[in-house]
Amino acid sequence: MKKVLVISKREFDKVMRDNKITAENIENRSKVAFISINDTFGTTETPFFKEDKENLRILFFDDVTEDTKLNWGTAKAFNKEQGKIVLEFLNKIKDRDTLIVHCHGLS
């Protein structure tokens, strides 16, 4: 992989729209891969994509070290299974030119 771009969700959504990348054609982007990191709570925004693709992984976790019960629900931590998913995905896409990663932090 030659380049990794880390951007906000807002910028990610804009890049997808500006480049006319959709769930139907994302796999045609043979030189690019994507990781979409989303919160599990506290947002009315939905992920740009709904399901994993050959070159896309969608993850849901919150900015906590361990699952944490709060007044409104449970914040979910990044876990070992998600770590394995990311590692397997990175191994699978290692020959792609670019990886674009976004997270849903406040932007």
Question: What are the roles of these predicted feature ranges?
Answer:
Residues D39-G42, V64, L106:
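Short, solvent-exposed loop/turn segments at secondary-structure junctions
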Residues N55-I100:
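Helix-loop module immediately N-terminal to the HCX5R catalytic loop
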Residues L99-S107:
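A phosphate-binding catalytic loop at a beta-strand-loop-alpha-helix junction
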Residues M1-L59:
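Glycine-rich, flexible N-terminal cofactor/catalytic loop recognition
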